[in-house]
Amino acid sequence: RLNSFIFLNHDLGNDTELYGELGYYRAESNSQRAETATLTSAPVTIANSAYWNPLGSGVNRLAGYDIPVEGLDVTIDAYRSLDAGPRAINVKNTSYRLLGGARGIKGDWDWDSAALYSAAKTVDSTANRISLSLFQDAVNRQDASAYNTFCAASCNSQDTIDSFKIDVERTGETALGLVDFKMSNAKLFALPAGNVGLAVGTEWRYENFENDYDDRLNGTVMYTDSVTGITYDSDVMGSSAQPNSDGSRNILSAFVEMAGPLVSPDMDIPFVNQLNFQIAGRYERYNDVGDVFKPKAVLSWYPVESLQIRGSYAEGFRAPNLEQLHTAVTSRVNYPTDFYRCQADINKGNVDSFSECSSSDSVSNIRLGNPNLKPEKDYNYGLGLVYTPTFVENLTFTADYWHIKQEDLVGIRSYQNIADLDYYQRLNGGSNSNVIRAEATSDDIAFFEGSGLAPVGDMVEVIGLFENLDSRETSGLDLGAYYKLRDTALGNFKFKLNAAKIIKAFQAVDSESAQLAALGLTLDDVGDLVQMDGRPEWQASGTLTWDYQNWGAGLYGKYVGEFYDTGAVQDDTGEFWLVDSWTTFSIYGQYTFDQGTFENTRVRLGVRNMLDKTPPLADETYGYEASLHNAEGRYVYLSLSMNFD
């Protein structure tokens, strides 16, 4: 990883300054994933003439079976090519940021104007992928060089394996351009309690994104089964088609904010030492999703000098991002449980409950952008206290309650709930058009016999569309304690402790989700969400820092509470997997030179996660919840920073 910045400032005189910033970031990561496997949505047919087909017409035909003389074709839709090796993933990220502006003072007004351009590029390359076309060619050869899918992983020659291995690449690029101007006046006019300030500003933004997929993924090079003649959009084994996508938009915004005192201490009003207000509004116009105006109001009351009571109300707005609006298709491989087939097992007495059902084979989870999305809206209010006791210097306690109601949330239903809805609708004589199934085979018909249910084929694709979902309410409590101990014989100390509790997180249940709940099925991201899927009830962090002359040190601790992972269910109890709490500590020591060649240079030696705590196990890609935990382990670092006047 490389991260570098350059900051420039130049004083023009007359209270005017030019400033600039140049930033560059580059990172490269490598990882491995399991060997490539076929999807039921893109099977491979082994021809009856293939050399290693045990049911074919060639020399390796099995004896003693009632097989036609011309042999049989064999379809494989759940085969993992172990001898091709694990997929090797290389990701390179680069980004840069250019900023130039000017700021100054004109009379009672402070002003600032700048232009910004930033761009980022990600190149995601995966080696040891498999071309379906080349794989089928290798399988259907009519000599011993053919690829054998019916033997141990070591039976095929490396030349044969290499004949169908490919590299697959995806490139993603984003760009942001911005020009703004803002100005403020702390003394716009005076009230009896003091001066009222005003800030105004305007901004223009340009956003752009492009996703360019490999030709074998975006439909340029497709896979046509040479036996059945069926054409599939993707030629990459284990991946559905991914069309290229792009989008851009312009945003014009303006804001105004006014703040000032209504009551001051020298007015000597009982129980109102101070009373301050803030009112603000912001307007935004998007060229793709419309415009909006949102207000904000804040009131701060000091009954006495040491106690502040503050309250606020604000409305918010979030436009769908460009990928949610414009992405044609994104695809992932998932393993949903097919409860319709499970119901057949229950009806026949093969299993007793849904908890005994197993997941399906690999199913393509297709996600589609939606240009008709509406912006999200939110309404939030808060009430807080700040107490600074007069009998202890530099000690502060804070407590803030907050409540947010969000409407028209942009999201996508989980692949499991989409599959569950197919189960519900089939029980009632219909089906879910967003669940694509293969034609029922003779094996499927035999499986459903005696269950009282109509036979169906395996799930092939589950399609999810970004949509505006129902409302969500969230509330919580933030607590803080801060203490500074200055000018002791041992130096200066600072202590900070923060804790956050989620009181409520409730996603409204829509009509489709209510249907599933009535059947006793688990709903993802619906209902009470406290302690569910990355939402621990409690989180906390604490910092202790010390400095003495040129020396300094710090200790940091972080606590993340336990929560349940709804993606994993314990077989013996049927309960969700409990992700344990996690506590880590980090420490550093530093020295700052204040004279000589290295003046204003700081050297820091630190250890992150000093106790080498591993993240708790979760049902995620790498085995842990990346939004809350990390697998970095104990990390020792040495940093050098220099300031130039």
Model regions and ranges:
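C-terminal beta-signal and adjacent terminal beta-strands/loops
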Residues: 396, 405-408, 503-506, 556-568, ...
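Transmembrane beta-strands of outer-membrane beta-barrel pores
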Residues: 24-28, 106-108, 115-123, 187, ...
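Transmembrane beta-strands of outer-membrane beta-barrel proteins
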Residues: 18-20, 111-113, 196-202, 273-279, ...
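C-terminal beta-barrel architecture of Gram-negative outer-membrane proteins
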Residues: 332, 491, 495-596
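Residues that define the transmembrane beta-barrel architecture of outer-membrane proteins
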Residues: 2, 92-96, 175-177, 248-254, ...
